[in-house]
Amino acid sequence: NDCEITIDTIEAHYWNYKIDPKKLDKSWGDSIYTDFSDFNECSLKMCVEIFNQDKADKLTRSLSDCDCIRFSDGFWYKFTKKNVTKENAIMKITEVCGFSTDSIIAFGDDYADIGMLELCGTGVAMGNAIDEVKERADIVIGSNDEDGIAGFIENEIL
């Protein structure tokens, strides 16, 4: 095993790398260590750390029914079913509920958020967002550590 992998299912978060379970982010829910040799769960997303760009490109090509987004911090790549995006989910919700995306405020900080920020009426980038997100947002607020969303809601909505 020469790469770190995480897979999220509806029930749990699976991972194959050596880390003290007490140090895992609790927001991941139930984290289960596995070597993935007999993994047979329906996954929502798979993240893989790949340090070699050629190998990352090869994996992306072999998973042609998936979209791939590289995370901004490091060499992690996220694979999800093709066209399963935040913006597509928002469009479905607005269709079912009967309101416009113009009435939605979206918050984001990384590549996977850009489409959502551009789609919604107000796109808000976190202060800790990557530059590409800040450039596409309507507003840039404080970072996650500065409670940027709470401040925005208190000052702009309430």
Task: State where each predicted segment sits.
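Mg2+-dependent phosphoryl-transfer enzymes with acidic/Ser/Thr/Gly-rich catalytic loops
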Residues: K78-L158
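Conserved acidic, metal-coordinating active-site core of Asp-based
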Residues: D2-F107, Y111-I114
